[in-house]
UniProtKB/Swiss-Prot annotation:
Protein name: Bifunctional purine biosynthesis protein PurH
Pathway: Purine metabolism; IMP biosynthesis via de novo pathway; 5-formamido-1-(5-phospho-D-ribosyl)imidazole-4-carboxamide from 5-amino-1-(5-phospho-D-ribosyl)imidazole-4-carboxamide (10-formyl THF route): step 1/1; Purine metabolism; IMP biosynthesis via de novo pathway; IMP from 5-formamido-1-(5-phospho-D-ribosyl)imidazole-4-carboxamide: step 1/1
Highest taxon of the lineage: Bacteria
Taxonomic lineage from the root: Bacteria, Bacillati, Bacillota, Bacilli, Lactobacillales
Domain description: The IMP cyclohydrolase activity resides in the N-terminal region.
The keyword Ligase belongs to this UniProt entry's keyword annotation: no
Residue runs in coiled coils: none
HAMAP family: PurH
PANTHER family: BIFUNCTIONAL PURINE BIOSYNTHESIS PROTEIN ATIC, BIFUNCTIONAL PURINE BIOSYNTHESIS PROTEIN PURH
Matching InterPro entries: AICAR_Tfase_dup_dom_sf, Cytidine_deaminase-like, MGS-like_dom, MGS-like_dom_sf, PurH-like
GO molecular function: IMP cyclohydrolase activity; phosphoribosylaminoimidazolecarboxamide formyltransferase activity
Length: 515
């Protein structure tokens, strides 16, 4: 009995060569619409789908493969006699191979000029149905959704006359992943269009971006996936100009770094980061000086760290970056001379280029945190804050220089692991106290790091001070300005301690925990 293949594809890469080989192996080919036209123009004889069903394609192609003579030929179990008898009685001929990929819904909705009606028309109905029917009956039917699998299938058909069960099972799993991902993108689009923010079902789809050597540690397997609908300002979308592949830890650190720099748009700024905590942030009127400040903030921790700059890297800055060991540099662009310097004798230095103009669009993306058996979803901590809404709760008011430093420190604090303390002036961080289980310990770490630079420095805390003991430590260090959310039942004690030591203190009313 002559074997039959059904071919209907949007992505026509390699389809003519596949069809020619199938014909050479003695297969009949059923095809539809544009696919059939492409094959016929290439000299491949096919059978029109409506010649099989007896019904013409109708409703602008919405109805063409949804027919018992097609799905019966796919779903009939070859090992069950009454299935075969039913097929024979109803003039259903078996179909042994399905080659289908779907209307380009994702690509369509990514275009800026697409209307809702056009998007709806790009929802494929018949294609997923064919794939699911064929994949369900993979014991007998081979289903192919990816042109890169054509050589595998043709090789087995040419060698043995059929595909192996292992191949059919693997391709069936791939087909189900394909249709699931396709439907997830559609569901996400319709959910957004309907304005729903808390759907009862959350379906996410990501595409494999990079197979990794290992995860956070060598004993952990890991891979890197990119959102099926990519966002531009993302490490997954960054252009790599030099260096080895990004590691698991590189990616996490780089993501933290580009989130921080996003809050510093107004002036040239450099962020140095290690283990997802900023170790130095500097801002100035030019990027070279901003780098000088970021480096001076902690020249020890920056060794082997990640640096992100929000302006083009020029030659002078590149020469300074080249002088120390860094894992990764990220910037919106690099001058030709700067790139030549950075890559000289540093083939392993990872250099990324990222479109900073797309920063704002990235702020609406949800954050997902996995827990055992569950997933936490939240908005990013990108609340708009204005110093006009802050309240000075002490007797002494901050002066202009202190106010600028407090605003700078407050931008920085939300990116430090809680309990978090930052000591800074108006252009650079001086001490970082991250991730301690009690706040006074973070205060002590930040003060110790900033020793010798505390003249005119200010301090920020990501959450309220539960006791006045931290204020006493801060006062003893000579710091005269504090910014914090407030909200403790003992706020009055902290305010009294600040007043006693002539410290000005601001309550912002906004907490910035980071775990």
């Amino acid at each position: 009995m002559t074997k039959r293949a059904l071919i209907s594809v949007s992505d026509k890469r390699g389809i003519v060569d596949l069809a020619r080989e199938l014909k050479h192996l003695g297969w009949d080919i059923i095809s539809t619409g544009g696919t059939r036209l492409a094959l016929e123009e290439a000299g491949v004889v096919t059978v029109a789908i409506d010649d099989v069903t007896g019904f013409p394609e109708m409703m602008d192609g919405r109805v063409k493969t949804l027919h018992p003579l097609i799905h019966g030929g796919l779903l009939a179990r070859r090992d069950i006699e009454h299935h075969l008898q039913a097929a024979k009685q109803n003039r259903i001929e078996l179909i042994d191979l399905v080659v289908v990929n779907l209307y380009p819904f994702k690509e369509t909705i990514c275009r800026s000029d697409i209307t809702y009606d056009v998007a709806v028309d790009m929802v494929d109905i018949g294609g997923p149905s064919l794939l699911r029917s064929a994949a369900k009956n993979h014991a007998s039917v081979t289903v192919v959704v990816d042109p890169t699998d054509y050589p595998l299938v043709l090789g087995e058909l040419a060698s043995t006359g059929s595909t192996s069960y292992q191949t059919r099972q693997s391709l069936a799993a791939k087909a189900f992943r394909h249709t699931a991902a396709y439907d997830a993108v559609i569901a996400d689009y319709f959910t957004r269009q309907a304005g729903e923010t808390k759907p009862e079902k959350l379906t996410l789809t990501y595409d494999l971006k990079q197979s990794m050597r290992y995860g956070e540690n060598p004993q952990q397997a890991a891979d890197f996936y990119q959102r099926a609908l990519p966002i531009t300002y993302s490490i997954a979308s960054a252009k790599q100009l030099n260096g080895k592949e990004l590691s698991f830890n590189n990616i996490r650190d780089a993501d933290a770094a580009i989130r921080i720099i996003r809050d510093f748009k107004e002036r040239p700024t450099v962020v140095a980061l290690k283990h997802m905590n900023p170790c130095g942030i500097g801002q100035a009127d030019d990027i070279e000086t901003a780098w000088d400040f970021a480096y001076a903030a902690d020249p020890v921790s920056i060794f082997g760290g990640i640096v992100v700059l929000n302006r083009e890297v020029d030659l002078a800055t590149a020469e300074k970056l080249h002088a120390i060991f860094l894992e990764l540099i990220i910037a919106p662009s690099y001058s030709k001379e700067a790139l030549a310097v950075l890559t000289h004798k540093k083939k392993h230095l990872r250099i990324l280029e990222l479109p900073f103009a797309a920063q704002e669009a990235s702020e609406i993306e949800a954050e997902y945190t996995g827990v055992l058996g569950g997933l936490l979803v939240q908005n990013q901590d990108v609340v708009t804050e204005s110093p006009a809404d802050w309240i000075v709760v002490t007797k002494r008011q901050p002066n202009e220089q202190e106010m600028a430093a407090l605003a700078f420190a407050w931008k920085t604090i939300k990116y430090v692991k809680s309990n978090a303390i930052i000591i800074a002036n108006d252009h650079m961080t001086l001490g970082v106290g991250p991730g301690q289980t009690n706040r006074i310990a973070s205060v002590r770490i930040a003060i110790a790091q900033a020793t010798g630079q505390l003249e005119g420095a200010v301090l920020a805390s990501d959450a309220f001070f539960p006791f006045a003991d931290s204020i006493e430590e801060i006062a003893a260090a000579g710091i005269k300005a504090i910014i914090q959310p407030g909200g403790s039942i003992r706020d009055s004690e902290s305010i009294a301690a600040a007043d006693q030591h002539g410290i000005t203190m601001i309550f912002t009313g906004v907490r910035h925990f980071r775990h």
